[in-house]
Amino acid sequence: MRTINDVMNLSIEDLELSVRSINCMKNMGIRTLAELTGKKQEDFFKIRNMGKKSQAEITSKLEAIGLTYEMTNRDWLNWGVNHIDWIKLH
Protein backbone atom coordinates (compact mmCIF):
# COMPACT_ATOMS: atom_id res chain seq x y z
CA MET A 1 0.00 0.00 0.00
CA ARG A 2 1.21 3.49 -0.81
CA THR A 3 1.81 6.05 1.89
CA ILE A 4 1.35 9.81 1.96
CA ASN A 5 5.11 10.12 1.39
CA ASP A 6 4.79 8.02 -1.75
CA VAL A 7 2.10 10.38 -3.05
CA MET A 8 4.14 13.45 -2.08
CA ASN A 9 7.07 12.05 -4.05
CA LEU A 10 5.05 11.34 -7.20
CA SER A 11 6.70 12.83 -10.25
CA ILE A 12 4.92 15.79 -11.80
CA GLU A 13 5.12 13.81 -15.04
CA ASP A 14 2.62 11.35 -13.55
CA LEU A 15 -0.02 14.09 -13.29
CA GLU A 16 -1.00 13.86 -16.97
CA LEU A 17 -0.42 17.55 -17.66
CA SER A 18 0.60 19.19 -20.92
CA VAL A 19 4.25 19.18 -21.96
CA ARG A 20 4.33 22.97 -21.63
CA SER A 21 3.11 22.85 -18.02
CA ILE A 22 5.57 20.09 -17.13
CA ASN A 23 8.49 21.93 -18.73
CA CYS A 24 7.60 25.19 -16.97
CA MET A 25 7.52 23.42 -13.62
CA LYS A 26 10.83 21.71 -14.33
CA ASN A 27 12.32 25.13 -15.12
CA MET A 28 11.15 26.21 -11.65
CA GLY A 29 12.93 23.22 -10.12
CA ILE A 30 9.68 21.38 -9.38
CA ARG A 31 9.98 17.62 -9.80
CA THR A 32 7.50 16.16 -7.29
CA LEU A 33 3.93 16.71 -6.18
CA ALA A 34 5.17 17.89 -2.76
CA GLU A 35 7.42 20.50 -4.39
CA LEU A 36 4.48 21.69 -6.49
CA THR A 37 2.08 21.99 -3.57
CA GLY A 38 4.74 23.80 -1.54
CA LYS A 39 4.80 26.71 -3.98
CA LYS A 40 2.68 29.84 -3.92
CA GLN A 41 0.35 30.22 -6.87
CA GLU A 42 1.90 33.64 -7.53
CA ASP A 43 5.27 31.95 -8.18
CA PHE A 44 3.89 30.69 -11.49
CA PHE A 45 3.13 34.18 -12.80
CA LYS A 46 6.86 34.89 -13.12
CA ILE A 47 7.76 31.86 -15.23
CA ARG A 48 8.50 32.24 -18.91
CA ASN A 49 5.99 30.41 -21.15
CA MET A 50 3.66 29.81 -18.19
CA GLY A 51 0.45 31.36 -19.42
CA LYS A 52 -2.98 31.47 -17.87
CA LYS A 53 -3.99 28.25 -19.59
CA SER A 54 -1.07 26.30 -18.08
CA GLN A 55 -1.68 27.84 -14.67
CA ALA A 56 -5.35 26.89 -14.87
CA GLU A 57 -4.47 23.35 -15.95
CA ILE A 58 -2.17 22.84 -12.96
CA THR A 59 -4.63 24.38 -10.49
CA SER A 60 -7.46 22.27 -11.89
CA LYS A 61 -5.42 19.08 -11.55
CA LEU A 62 -4.55 19.88 -7.93
CA GLU A 63 -8.16 20.69 -7.09
CA ALA A 64 -9.35 17.47 -8.75
CA ILE A 65 -7.37 15.45 -6.22
CA GLY A 66 -8.09 17.72 -3.27
CA LEU A 67 -4.73 19.49 -3.17
CA THR A 68 -3.79 23.15 -3.24
CA TYR A 69 -0.78 25.45 -3.16
CA GLU A 70 1.27 26.29 -0.04
CA MET A 71 0.55 22.97 1.65
CA THR A 72 2.36 22.16 4.89
CA ASN A 73 3.14 18.70 6.26
CA ARG A 74 0.06 19.03 8.48
CA ASP A 75 -2.05 19.80 5.39
CA TRP A 76 -0.66 16.67 3.73
CA LEU A 77 -1.54 14.54 6.76
CA ASN A 78 -5.08 15.90 6.78
CA TRP A 79 -5.33 15.27 3.05
CA GLY A 80 -4.11 11.69 3.52
CA VAL A 81 -6.72 10.96 6.16
CA ASN A 82 -9.48 12.27 3.89
CA HIS A 83 -8.21 10.67 0.68
CA ILE A 84 -7.08 7.20 1.75
CA ASP A 85 -8.98 5.61 -1.16
CA TRP A 86 -7.16 7.81 -3.68
CA ILE A 87 -3.82 6.86 -2.13
CA LYS A 88 -4.67 3.16 -2.43
CA LEU A 89 -5.54 3.52 -6.11
CA HIS A 90 -2.49 5.53 -7.11
Regions found by a protein language model. Give the residues of each.
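Compact, charge-rich alpha-helical regulatory domains located at protein termini
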Residues: M1-H90
